[in-house]
């Protein structure tokens, strides 16, 4: 009996403990079922939310391009980020982000974009962006090397071509020296003009070089009556008058020769002083008008022969002695303003805004309408 009572007590305690465990298991299973039901409901809600289409502007690319052309790069970047947050499947917009960062030379933004793509595990887009970034970086290095080589070549050419420039200056000075010779010839021609009374005043005009008909006998009579006032030039004046009277009597009608035309071209017009002769009172019988068929008279100027001085000098041919054009003939056909525009654009891509602005401001007056529009776009790019 002593052993039966504790055995019964232990049996009752065991039964009570078993009942409690069953109740706890039942309550835990009910909690698990409730959690499963809640998870199923949340997943169904997520699927329904994913199935609902995201409304995105179909002309998003045109809007982004328009903002980039205007120069509002920050607004374009904000629009791209907003679109990617609403629809992460638009992978082509990541390339737009890369272009914007390259335009702004934002290396930090490019690194953040690459890290974001690595976290999202978008390996295809990441490979495209890394390849494009590598190509643009290589192109910038090539352009920088080309610009440095051009500047070095220009400096070397200017250093080596300085003796040729001095020689060209000397050649131009030698071409301009014959001017005093012409002055000397004109002075000599003026000193050779004799002062006796003219035989007959002849009105010379540029349109007609012929002289009206005159009576030779009257000219000879006037030549006999000529008296020279200065005593020093007596001999020279007499010889000159005789030569003129002979040539007036023997010369056929013809136009002025080539020497006279050359002298008109090389010499200025010399106004001969008109000397009034005193009237001679001689009994003259009334003239009888008889028409004589005499050849027309042409007057010739008698000047001492001057070798090569009376011929018109040919126009001096200006030879371009620019050492750059001699070394690189293709530079003569280049448009400097267009070249400066392209160079300014390269400076902007490299980040040298100050030098690009200097180039655009220097050539603003030389630009055409299209070039002005391009320069305004470049200035907007720098300002943004």
Swiss-Prot record:
Keyword ATP-binding applies: no
Segments traversing the membrane: 1-21
InterPro entries: FimV_C_sf
Major localization listed first in the record, in broad terms: membrane
Record's signal peptide: none
Disruption phenotype: Deletion of the gene results in dispersed T4P localization. It also results in diffuse, cytoplasmic localization of PilG and FimL.
Keyword check for Cell membrane: yes
Function: Localization determinant of type IV pili (T4P) machinery. Plays a role in regulating T4P positioning by connecting the Pil-Chp chemosensory system to subcellular T4P localization. FimV likely recruits FimL and PilG to the cell membrane where T4P are assembled.
Protein name: Type IV pili machinery localization factor FimV
Origin organism lineage: Bacteria, Pseudomonadati, Pseudomonadota, Gammaproteobacteria, Moraxellales
């Amino acid at each position: 009996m002593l052993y039966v009572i504790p055995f019964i007590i232990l049996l009752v305690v065991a039964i009570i403990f078993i009942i409690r465990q069953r109740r706890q298991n039942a309550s835990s299973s009910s909690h698990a079922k409730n959690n499963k039901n809640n998870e199923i409901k949340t997943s169904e809600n997520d699927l329904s939310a994913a199935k609902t289409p995201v409304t995105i502007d179909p002309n998003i690319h045109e809007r982004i391009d328009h903002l980039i052309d205007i120069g509002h790069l920050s607004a374009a970047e904000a629009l791209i980020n907003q679109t990617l947050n609403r629809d992460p499947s638009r992978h082509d917009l990541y390339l737009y982000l890369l272009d914007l960062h390259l335009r702004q030379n934002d290396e930090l933004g490019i690194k953040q974009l690459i890290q974001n793509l690595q976290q999202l595990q978008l390996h295809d887009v990441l490979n495209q962006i890394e390849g494009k970034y590598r190509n643009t970086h290589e192109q910038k290095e090539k352009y920088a090397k080309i610009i440095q080589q051009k500047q070095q070549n220009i400096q070397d050419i200017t250093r080596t071509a300085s003796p040729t420039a001095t020689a060209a200056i000397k050649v131009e000075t030698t071409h301009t020296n014959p001017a005093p010779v012409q002055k000397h010839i004109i002075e000599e021609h003026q000193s050779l003009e004799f002062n006796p009374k003219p035989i007959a005043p002849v009105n010379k005009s540029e349109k007609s070089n012929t002289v009206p008909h005159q009576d030779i006998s009257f000219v000879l009579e006037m030549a006999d009556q000529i008296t020279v006032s200065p005593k020093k030039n007596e001999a020279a004046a007499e010889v000159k008058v005789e030569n003129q009277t002979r040539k007036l009597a023997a010369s056929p009608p013809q136009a002025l020769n080539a020497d006279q035309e050359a002298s008109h071209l090389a010499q200025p017009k010399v106004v001969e002083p008109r000397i009034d002769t005193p009237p001679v009172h001689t009994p003259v019988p009334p003239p009888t008008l008889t028409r004589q068929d005499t050849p027309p008279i042409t007057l010739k100027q008698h000047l001492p022969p001057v070798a090569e001085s009376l011929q018109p000098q040919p126009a001096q041919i200006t030879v371009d002695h620019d050492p750059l054009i001699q070394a690189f003939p293709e530079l003569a056909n280049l448009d400097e303003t267009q070249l400066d525009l392209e160079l300014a654009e390269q400076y902007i891509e490299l980040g040298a805004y100050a030098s690009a602005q200097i180039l655009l401001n220097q050539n603003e007056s030389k630009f055409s309408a299209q070039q002005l529009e391009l320069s305004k776009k470049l200035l907007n790019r720098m300002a943004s």
